[in-house]
A protein has these predicted regions:
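N-terminal polyanion-binding entry modules of DNA glycosylases/AP lyases
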Residues: 1-113, 119
């Protein structure tokens, strides 16, 4: 009963955010992992313009896995905590190489990704 109320409240009050769009599940996974890494230690309002710019230049998991570090850090510039960007790229490479470009579907595999851990 409480879950229904929470979901109802969310449907009526959720914020419109660029990573909450209708898209394919593969794209949704990419938007989610990029946003989660960017949101570590950073407020939503700060992340949004960086997120949008990042996606213009690095639009999917495969391109993230292959991007040169210099370009990666250029598109991350201003967010700080550059280890997040480096871990995001390492995670993307592992996802592409070991999981056919899809996020692992279990908790233990997710925790093996650099920069992913308990909340």
């Amino acid at each position: 009963m409480i879950a229904k109320k929470i979901l109802y409240w969310y449907d009526n009050n959720k914020r419109s955010l660029p990573w909450r769009v209708n898209c394919t599940s593969i794209k949704k996974e990419y938007l989610t992992i990029v946003s989660e890494f960017m949101l570590q230690q950073t407020q939503v309002a700060t992340v949004i313009p960086y997120f949008n710019n990042f996606l213009r230049h690095i639009p999917n998991m495969a391109s993230l896995a292959k991007v040169k570090e210099e370009k990666l850090l250029k598109y991350w510039q201003g967010l700080g905590y550059y280890s997040r960007a480096k871990n995001l790229k390492k995670s993307a490479k592992m996802i592409v190489d070991n999981h056919n470009g899809r996020l692992p579907n279990n908790f233990l595999e997710l925790k093996k990704l650099p920069g992913v851990g308990d909340y």
